[in-house]
């Protein structure tokens, strides 16, 4: 079973992926996590990625696909994956279609206001990379490993609007691509919803596959 989680940054893709891993045994693959891993290691590819993300720009398709395909080929992905943050362009969707059968695309639809609120209150652990939402997690240290929490540069106000604009510019044709393939399911999220509220809708659809 291979699933794509689609939606703007801050819509809750990471939380939904965590639930799907727990309940269906899928491997969570986040392009953002893969990028940060490459950057942390300061590999040649990581330095290339860093030059884009540090200024709020999109990482080019060919670089993103190279990183992702290398991960999908690993043995632990044989039972199925949940892709978080990929594809982000129609070219990426078409390239993915050639190498991996996608069973379902779940698009989490949120307003700009929700994105601004959630990203503005999102913090990451410096030690293990776990993301915490200040609205739900009333803590000052990582609840997974006890590490220090910090706000990523691209979660700060000056970058959020640019990320939204980039997302909207490409996402319509991606949704059309999967809608035409009868693989698209849209979840309309609300600001007052907890991650568990949203996941109840997602789980019901996935369980029917």
Language-model segments: residues:
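Hydrophobic anchor at the beta1->P-loop junction of P-loop NTPases
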Residues: 3-5
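ATP-dependent NMP and nucleoside kinases share a basic, alpha-helical "lid"
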Residues: 73, 86-135
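ATP-dependent small-molecule kinase phosphotransfer cores
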Residues: 27-101, 152
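NTP-dependent small-molecule kinase module
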Residues: 19, 148-209
């Amino acid at each position: 079973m291979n699933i794509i989680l689609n939606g703007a940054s801050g819509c809750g893709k990471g939380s939904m992926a965590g639930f799907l891993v727990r309940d269906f045994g899928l491997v969570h693959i986040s392009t953002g996590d893969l990028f940060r891993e490459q950057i942390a290691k300061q590999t040649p590819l990581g330095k290339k990625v860093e030059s884009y993300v540090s200024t709020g720009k999109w990482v080019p398709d060919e670089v993103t696909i190279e990183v992702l395909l290398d991960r999908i080929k690993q043995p632990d992905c044989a039972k199925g994956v949940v892709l978080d943050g990929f594809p982000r362009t129609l070219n990426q969707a078409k390239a993915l279609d050639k190498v991996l059968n996608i069973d379902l695309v779940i698009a989490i639809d949120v307003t700009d206001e929700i994105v601004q609120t959630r990203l503005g209150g999102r913090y990451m652990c410096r030690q293990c990379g776990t993301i915490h939402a200040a609205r739900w997690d009333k803590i000052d240290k990582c609840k997974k490993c006890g590490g220090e929490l910090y706000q990523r540069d691209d979660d700060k106000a000056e970058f959020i609007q640019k990320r939204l604009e980039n997302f909207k510019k490409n996402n319509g044709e991606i949704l059309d691509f999967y809608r035409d393939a009868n693989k698209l399911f849209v979840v309309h999220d609300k600001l007052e919803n907890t991650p568990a509220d949203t996941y109840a809708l997602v789980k019901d659809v996935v369980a029917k596959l």
